[in-house]
Amino acid sequence: MGISKKSQVSRELDTDGKKFIFAKTSIRASLKPVKTKLIKPERESEDGICITPTARGAKTPECPAAPRKRPPVLKCQNNIRIEYFVPPSDFELVFIQRR
């Protein structure tokens, strides 16, 4: 009914240089129309409707705020000299010279 008696053959080259042959046959068949009926959606009762719960017990607890960043550590300034020991002017007199 839908098959033609004549078949077509085509010869082609592959990317690798190999030859291959396709046998082309056409199938012609008439399709019958599909009949469908439109189904009206049924009205759902109030029990079947999905509603987001709004009660206090249904709400998820809120997360606490994120911790704050710590302030940056003050770095020592190299320009300031700290003198731990100030030698007295007569400090050299403490030492005895030996020859």
Swiss-Prot record:
The protein's name in its UniProt record: Cyclin-dependent protein kinase inhibitor SMR7
Gene expressing this chain: SMR7
Q: Name one GO biological process term.
A: DNA damage response
Q: Does the keyword Cell cycle apply?
A: yes
What triggers expression? Answer: Up-regulated by DNA damage and oxidative stress. Down-regulated by iron excess treatment.
**Lineage, top ranks:** Eukaryota, Viridiplantae, Streptophyta, Embryophyta, Tracheophyta
Q: Which UniProt keywords apply?
A: Cell cycle, Protein kinase inhibitor
Q: Which GO terms describe its molecular function?
A: protein kinase inhibitor activity
Q: Describe the task this protein carries out.
A: Probable cyclin-dependent protein kinase (CDK) inhibitor that functions as a repressor of mitosis in the endoreduplication cell cycle. Acts as a potent cell cycle inhibitor, regulating a hydroxyurea-dependent checkpoint in leaves.
Q: Does the keyword Repeat apply?
A: no
Q: Where is this region: Disordered?
A: 49-70
Q: In which tissues is it expressed?
A: Expressed in root meristems after induction.
